[in-house]
Amino acid sequence: KGKIRQIVSADIDFNAKVLRKRMEERFQSYDFKHGDQLYMSFRSPVNGYLAVYLYDGQEMVYCLLPYIRQEDGCFSIKRNEEYILFSPDGSSSDIVDEYNLTASRDKEVNLIYIIFSPNKFTKALDDSSGEELPRSLDYKSFQKWLVKCRNKDVEMRVQRKTVKITR
């Protein structure tokens, strides 16, 4: 004899990989050297929306996706399509931002937040920090935004990837 209960939400099993220097999945890595190019592969079984943020481990969070030139504040994902993010070789080459990871100390640890939902959501309110850096906000404001989004959207999923950068 079993019990019946309502499924509130099923996990969306998306696939996100951090790639170092090359745009192929075999170059998945969490260990970077100062100046290495950052790419990310992403695939989802459902249509949805994606945002990617990088926390510098100190006080700032940088919005890597949606791209700076995207005016609508969200990045759309089509189900079962493979995306290589931060690469100029894709269909969105006119709006892509490319990133090199840098370290101001001998060793740094950063967190990459990969945020996906089948429901439309808008990126956090952030500020432009100049041409060399992506838009940013402080860590406390980012956490407040993320908690608010997750409370409103039970289907939102967040993966955190730890990235080490050495000089």
Task: Describe the predicted segments one by one.
Residues 1-167:
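Secretory-pathway glycoprotein ectodomains that are cysteine- and/or Ser/Thr/Pro-rich
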